[in-house]
From Swiss-Prot:
Residues 1-35 form a transit peptide. This is Small ribosomal subunit protein mS40. Transmembrane segments: none annotated. It comes from the Eukaryota. The lineage of its organism: Eukaryota, Metazoa, Chordata, Craniata, Vertebrata. It comes from Sus scrofa. One of its GO terms (biological process) is mitochondrial translation. The gene is MRPS18B.
Length: 258
């Protein structure tokens, strides 16, 4: 009687189907389908920093002083690498999506640190106070992604005048470069022109040897006009007399009485 009533109730329930086991025991089966949780939801979410809009306030907070004190954020960081020689470059990035790598860099491990050109106190920790050179990534231990952000933020802070940097002082020179360098100065005159000699030595008059003169006399006997001394171009010029004076000095001209 009880079994018949149970069978009637099972027929009326759509989600429950009767199943008779091997030993005559009825087993109730009911399919319960639940949605599997997505893989991304299983990972812990990255906490949102309260200092995202104003990152410079975190460096003045008591929490920062208790954690870092007066030392830079990368002072106590030690890189985790294989072997005794560290790689030349740090990892590309520490956070990929919601996955955080083991032993993250000094900036990625603290979610309240934000690289911003207005966060001057943080940027000063990655710049040498004596030379103004930005520390290399293997020296500070930051990943290459954060190192690129730091370099861009430091340059932007310098452009806005928030971060001081060294400008080399160059003393002005009171020298006239038009006369100090040989390539731009006036060309000095040739030594031969200063002494009055001609530019080429064969332009100056030289008395030929006597042996050569005797040979020419024998060769051009009766047709050679004897000359001695420099050529006529270098001989002193005789002043020319006026035509009136020349006519008065003629022998047949009458002379005026005194």
């Amino acid at each position: 009687m009880a079994a018949s009533i149970l069978n009637v109730l099972l027929r009326r329930l759509p989600g429950v189907s009767p199943f008779r086991g091997a030993y005559g025991v009825q087993v109730l089966l009911q399919t319960l389908c639940t949605k599997a949780p997505p893989e991304d939801d299983s990972l812990p979410q990255v906490p949102i920093s309260p200092y995202k809009d104003e990152p410079w306030k975190y460096l003045d907070s008591e929490e920062y002083q208790n954690r870092y004190g007066s030392r830079p954020v990368w002072a106590d960081y030690r890189r985790n690498h294989k072997g005794g020689i560290p790689p030349q470059r740090t990892r590309k990035m520490c956070i990929r999506g919601n996955k955080v790598a083991g032993n993250p860099c000094p900036i990625c491990r603290d979610q309240k640190l934000h690289v911003d050109f207005r966060n001057v106190k943080l940027l000063e920790q990655f710049v040498c106070a004596h030379t103004g050179i930005i520390f290399h990534a293997p020296y500070t231990g930051v990943c290459m992604k954060q190192h690129k952000k730091l370099t861009q933020a430091i340059q932007k802070a310098r452009d806005h005048g928030l971060l001081r940097y060294h400008i080399p002082q160059v003393e002005p020179r009171d020298l006239d470069f038009s006369t100090t360098h040989g390539a731009v100065s006036s060309t000095p005159p040739a030594p031969t022109l200063v002494s009055g000699d001609p530019w080429y030595p064969w332009y100056s008059w030289k008395q030929p040897p006597e042996r050569e003169l005797s040979r020419l006399r024998r060769l051009y006997q009766g047709r050679l006009r004897e000359e001695s001394g420099p050529p006529p171009e270098l001989m002193p010029e005789v002043p020319l007399t006026a035509p009136a004076e020349a006519s008065s000095t003629e022998p047949g001209a009458p002379q005026s009485a005194l």
